[in-house]
Design a protein with these regions (language model features):
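A general alpha-helix detector
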Residues: 15, 53-57, 94
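Conserved glycosyltransferase catalytic-site signature
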Residues: 13, 48, 107-111
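Short, well-structured N-terminal submotif of metal-dependent ribonuclease cores
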Residues: 1-46, 62-71
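Helix-adjacent hinge/juxtasegments
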Residues: 56-85
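Short loop/helix-cap segments at secondary-structure boundaries that form the rim of catalytic
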Residues: 131-139
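Active-site neighborhoods of divalent-metal-dependent phosphate/nucleic-acid chemistry enzymes
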Residues: 2-4, 82-128
Length: 146
């Protein structure tokens, strides 16, 4: 995989899940992205929401023990020195604006993630669900596997 990425990127929950699931067909691709972060070639950012969604996927979907999930996610965050963004006092206002300007709101949670990103001055996200973010002004969504 050739690196054409640089700078700050939010990693969507799907990438975190693939990167923690060694049986995933995307595991090695995401691992390469993690390596770029470790090497300082990109800055990996996640929102608190991504952490919650990843925990949910492993506990409810994979039926993994909560202790194992916490250990693995904390280890990933620490090992890669991942920067974590959070909603701020007015994130809901941007969320409502995005939502009200959408003709067909597809994924409410992605809209809230986009609002959190914009409030933190970040507009780029790596995700396999680019269509969910492509309708949101100010957000650049890239599928790293294309």
């Amino acid at each position: 995989m050739k690196n054409t990425l640089n700078g700050k990127w939010v990693f969507d929950s799907n990438l975190l899940i693939y990167g923690l699931d060694k049986s995933s067909s995307r595991y090695h691709d995401v691992y390469h992205l993690f390596e770029l972060g470790k090497e300082g070639k990109i800055q990996i950012i996640v929102a608190q929401q991504n952490i919650i969604e990843t925990v949910h996927a492993f506990v409810k979907g994979y039926k993994s023990p909560i202790e194992e999930v916490i250990y693995n996610i904390k280890g990933l965050l620490d090992e890669l020195d991942i920067y974590i963004i959070t909603p701020i006092n007015k994130t809901h206002s941007i969320f409502f604006e995005i939502l009200s300007n959408s003709s067909d709101p597809s994924d409410i949670f992605d809209y809230y993630l986009a609002a959190t990103m914009l409030d933190n001055g970040i507009n780029r996200i790596l995700t396999i669900n680019t269509k969910d973010f492509s309708k949101i002004p100010g957000i650049e969504a890239v599928n790293p596997f294309n």
